[in-house]
Amino acid sequence: MDLTEFNEIRPYNDEELPQIFEELIADPAFRKAATGAIPNVPFELLAQKMRTCKTKLDFQKAFCYGILWKIAEEHTNGLTLDHNALPNKKKAYTYISNHRDIILDSGFLSILLVDQGMDTVEIAIGDNLLIYPWIKKLVRVNKSFIVQRALTMRQMLEASTRMSRYMHYTIAEKNQSIWIAQREGRAKDSNDRTQDSVLKMLAMGGEGDLIDRLKEMNIAPLAISYEYDPCDFLKAREFQLKRDIEGYKKTTQDDLINMQTGLFGYKGKVHFQVASCINDELEQIDRSLPKPELFAAISACIDQRIYRNYRMYPGNYVAYDWLNGTTEFTGIYSQEEKQQFVGYIEQQLGKIEIPNKDEALLREKLLLMYANPLINHLAACR
């Protein structure tokens, strides 16, 4: 295998870090961002600390770990991980999860794994988010590999094949776990579905038939449950803008606002629930099925694991009853919890500034974001 084919997309190797650190330290835009993120420490001290990091994990423990736990302490009401379904802590897995937050889904997962004596994950990140050169360098220091997006069909096929080979190499040869979202972009309505395109990409690398190739990846579904999504009002706003403006697309500024709101908005309780590896289930699938049916069966297997492992909060039940005009779950939440959630939804609605604001649509979209995980959870647990 020619490892140089991965040079453009892979995380930096540890021996490359000194040069990259010097490039970052010399970049005024990075200096400004670093002093904003860690305001109480002079930049020269941060630079000195960076230079002492010999590995990517050293860097993550020196900088990212503390920052992420600070975010968790200030902007959540508790951050937890249950990894008991995968007792072998030395094995490399591909964690495929529902996608709620651009930065924190993978960031929180890594610090939780470290606290349970495991390594951090490599992260698939779209190049559309790498809007400045220093960001692209920093994410590659932080164990990210790059998903190339704005390409022609032919380029996309080549890029996907290369990324798949890289991921197979990472699991099999580096024994390094990976996190990847089940779909491109976040599910704006929290109706989480694994995209066939993600599985097709994973099956481009490796050896054997489609099932063998996916088994090589040791896929472990991961359910991420945020009690509150601080970006919910931005997602609702986007629904109306897409309805009202033909061809509406988010700007780079919108992406930055979503990242900032996701990082520093209140999330309530946040729980990560790992399900067992799906290799045994893959063995049960009829390999002679047409490919579309095979991918549909595998996607459904991952989705069901995620749905069953969601953690439900009072707001999910309140949203379901409110949306459907029922009292089906009044035994599960108190009047106080109901009033708290109703107040939260109205508060989020109030943050939306938009021409011809359609409150009925926006409220419905907000409620769906909290009801859909429960709807899918109930269906999966029947």
Region spans (language model):
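Soluble catalytic domains of membrane acyltransferases
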Residues: 57-59, 64-278, 349-352
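Membrane-anchoring hydrophobic helices of lipid-metabolizing enzymes
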Residues: 1-93, 99-110, 114, 136, ...
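Phenylalanine-focused residue identity feature
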Residues: 6, 12, 21, 30, ...
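Short, highly charged low-complexity linear segments
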Residues: 166-168, 333-346, 365-372
